[in-house]
Amino acid sequence: QMRGSRSKALAERALVNCRYSLAAFSTGERRRRPPHGDRQCAELALHLQQSFEAAILTHLYPRSQIDIYVQILQADGGNYCAGVNAATLAVMDAGIPMRDYVCASTAGLAEETPLADLSAPEEAAGGPRLVLALLPATGQIALLQLSARLHQERLEAALEAAGQACRALHAVLDRGVRERLREVT
Amino acid sequence: MAAITMRLPVPRRAVGPSAPRGGEKHLVAPGDTITTDTGYMRGHGTYVEEEKLIASVAGAVERVNKLVCVKALKTRYNGEVGDIVVGRITEVQQKRWKVETNSRLDSVLLLSSMNLPGGELRRRSAEDELAMRDYLQEGDLISAEVQSVFSDGAASLHTRSLKYGKLGQGVLVQVSPSLVKRQKTHFHDLPCGASVILGNNGFIWIYPTAEQKDEEAGGFTTNLEPVPLSDREVISRLRNCIVALVTQQLMLFDTSILYCYEASLPHQIKDILKPEVMEEIVLETRQRLLDLEG
């Protein structure tokens, strides 16, 4: 159903509405964050919306709204990725048709070695950071974001590392989903 | 006052399927290719990409001749003509009420589909529009039948019979729509002393059986007399039984609810919500249902 303003309802597909927030106790020191004013949260919510609009088959739900609210309980690097993976499972559990799983992972470089799934100290170190959201079956990229500068030659290696991590994640998520299906049917 | 019991969370053991299903079910997740054969027509839960039929929800594949569809575990209610639903009024608009029925879009109850008090048959005038709020307000529960479905999936309801209308005192249980079995009638008077309406949309309404069966008002006047304690106990027990059946994923219909109620009689009403007691009751119910099937 459409909640909030009716005028934003799209006639031929569903609107995906995402909200992203960090709990106060999620990082090392407890910080009280403004409820919705945080710019980083707004940006990550927009990224979530873009990734899921690419994955959910929205044309099957005209004039409706799909809400995805993500709250991070423990932040240790890769917040957005954890949010994407959790939201994928949530959307699948709700029975909303999707093209494929959306698996996300960060990748970076430390002195020529590509690293996958960076932790918070590694992210804070200031090196280049690549965030990749992938649809594993077809290999289509839903979102690709790079912060800090990266040499063009190193891009391939980092992308490959992130892709591998995403595919490994897909295997884990898939196993969980199938176990649950087997349990219930 | 009884003390509060607390317990630590423990992984749930699902009661496994007792009867072996005929054949292995083909379980899929989004992104899995179901078949590359172009001879099949695609149904719900699938989409076509580059001549491959790919699943879009996580569930079991159902094949009917040439039609392939994937049935998901948990979906919103999809209205079908002739279904009984129980819904809650969310909005009062110009000539209609918007009813929430656990579906993708709010269902619509048009003023012309509603019986006037007194059972008159006349064209609805402007005064009727202004008096809409006297009949049904936001937050009221109604039982209705689906008359038709709009192109975007919203259902249009009607209460054109005396058995539909505003619901009075009782208990609502919300379950997944896939657990309510399709039957000839969804209004049941259980012999234990309460009545139950099994809405196809997953809303189940339990209420005390009315003594006199003739109501000329068409279900508008709500009976606000105090309900006796014995009836309340029966209703609470039924509600806990339904919750127990739902957690073990058993189909809901009048016989299963009745057997579950009888199996739960030796326990106290509040004990039914404990996991071990729930498992025991549901096992017994399942056993009796299997015996019934023969």
What are these language model-derived features?
Chain A
Residues Q1-T185:
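Polyanion-binding surfaces on beta-sheet-dominated domains and ring/shell assemblies
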